[in-house]
């Protein structure tokens, strides 16, 4: 059962008819619906191609937030072996919104950091809907330090609406934790490959996203603030989020043209949630190619190039 977005009504109507026909055929073996099902499946493919070829920025935002979209732990299970997560910041607590640890990627040791949103009510609460607290960013710093110490390439997967803005998080130094994580991400002398797999929201995303190579999935978004947040600030009206999204340059195509990211990873027609295995496989290939390209560079060069990359972004935008 799919969770349909509001602009997917033509698809939901067609797939509803397909389910009815299959149910009818299952109840009465004398009824042959295969030809009609095949015809409707063709119409579904055509409808998805048409709809997804011209998504608006707000529609892409909805796809990036789709509840069935694969999250960090889905990628970790498929891309990495021997993934050993670290827990805690050695100061206050553990934060499950940030998953970080050591693993093997195609046989080679790596360090891995990502935000996890969860996929049901219980896990979403556990992972705080992917909005990290200060402890999460301090845990990320721990893993970055380990990667730097042992010369491990660092892979980061970004998927957050933003860092948690609660009073307790602010009291424990949320801004400092984000700044420290960003600083460490810029300073390590190992290759960093970053992929925005869903939402890339504000400093909560950039804290683990200052990679030598940064990629976005086709229907992911990346911005300094959510469309709702921008609408609330600009017009005091969060219901104008659609209008804000259209003016914020948040899509992968926009950010590639602005030089913020290095490449776009295609998604299956209908979004990553339609075929998680395919998009995870493509992501793995892109990461492997990027690490191979960066492998011949020394640590000082990697760090200098990364710093220059983000200085250029600041100057050019």
From Swiss-Prot:
Q: Does the keyword Transmembrane helix apply?
A: no
Q: Which reaction does it catalyse?
A: N(6)-carboxybiotinyl-L-lysyl-[protein] + acetyl-CoA = N(6)-biotinyl-L-lysyl-[protein] + malonyl-CoA
What taxonomic ancestry is recorded? Bacteria, Pseudomonadati, Pseudomonadota, Alphaproteobacteria, Hyphomicrobiales
The family line of this record is: Belongs to the AccA family.
Q: Name one Pfam family in it.
A: ACCA
InterPro entries the UniProt entry points to: Acetyl_CoA_COase_a_su (IPR001095), ClpP/crotonase-like_dom_sf (IPR029045), COA_CT_C (IPR011763)
Report the EC number(s), separated by commas if there are several: 2.1.3.15
Pathways per UniProt: Lipid metabolism; malonyl-CoA biosynthesis; malonyl-CoA from acetyl-CoA: step 1/1
Species assigned in the record: Sinorhizobium fredii (strain NBRC 101917 / NGR234)
Write out the annotated subcellular location.
Cytoplasm
Keyword entries, A-Z: ATP-binding, Cytoplasm, Fatty acid biosynthesis, Fatty acid metabolism, Lipid biosynthesis, Lipid metabolism, Nucleotide-binding, Transferase
Job description of the protein:
Component of the acetyl coenzyme A carboxylase (ACC) complex. First, biotin carboxylase catalyzes the carboxylation of biotin on its carrier protein (BCCP) and then the CO(2) group is transferred by the carboxyltransferase to acetyl-CoA to form malonyl-CoA.
NCBIfam families named among the record's database cross-references: accA, AccA_sub, PRK05724.1
GO molecular function (one): acetyl-CoA carboxylase activity
Q: Where is the CoA carboxyltransferase C-terminal domain?
A: 40-293
Q: Which GO terms describe its biological process?
A: fatty acid biosynthetic process; malonyl-CoA biosynthetic process
> This protein is called what?
Acetyl-coenzyme A carboxylase carboxyl transferase subunit alpha
The record's top EC class is transferase
């Amino acid at each position: 059962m799919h969770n349909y977005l509001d602009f997917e009504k033509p698809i939901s109507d067609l797939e509803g008819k397909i389910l009815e026909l299959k149910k009818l055929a299952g109840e009465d073996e004398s009824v042959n619906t295969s030809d009609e099902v095949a015809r409707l499946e063709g119409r579904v493919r055509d409808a998805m191609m048409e709809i997804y070829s011209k998504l608006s920025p707000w529609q892409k935002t909805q796809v990036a937030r789709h509840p069935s979209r694969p999250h960090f732990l889905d990628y970790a299970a498929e891309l990495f072996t021997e993934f050993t997560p670290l827990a805690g910041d050695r100061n206050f607590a553990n934060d499950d919104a940030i998953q970080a640890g050591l693993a093997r990627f195609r046989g080679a040791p790596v360090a891995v950091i990502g935000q996890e949103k969860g996929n049901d009510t219980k896990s979403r609460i556990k992972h705080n809907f992917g909005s990290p607290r200060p402890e999460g960013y301090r845990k990320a710093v721990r893993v970055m330090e380990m990667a730097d110490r042992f010369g491990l390439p660092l892979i980061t997967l970004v998927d957050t609406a933003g860092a948690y803005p609660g009073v307790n998080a602010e009291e424990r130094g949320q801004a400092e934790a984000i700044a420290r994580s960003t600083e460490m991400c810029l300073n390590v002398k190992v290759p960093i490959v970053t992929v925005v797999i869903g939402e890339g929201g504000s400093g909560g995303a950039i804290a683990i996203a200052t990679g030598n190579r940064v990629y976005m999935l086709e229907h992911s978004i990346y911005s300094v603030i959510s469309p709702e947040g921008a609408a609330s600030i600009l017009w005091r009206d969060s219901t104008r989020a659609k209008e804000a999204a259209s003016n914020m340059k948040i899509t992968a195509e926009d950010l590639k043209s602005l030089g913020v990211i290095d490449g776009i990873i295609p998604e299956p027609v209908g979004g990553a949630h339609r075929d998680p295995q395919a998009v995870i496989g493509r992501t793995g290939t892109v990461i492997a190619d990027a690490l191979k390209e960066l492998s011949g560079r020394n640590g000082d060069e990697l760090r200098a190039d990364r710093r220059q990359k983000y200085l250029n972004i600041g100057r050019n935008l």
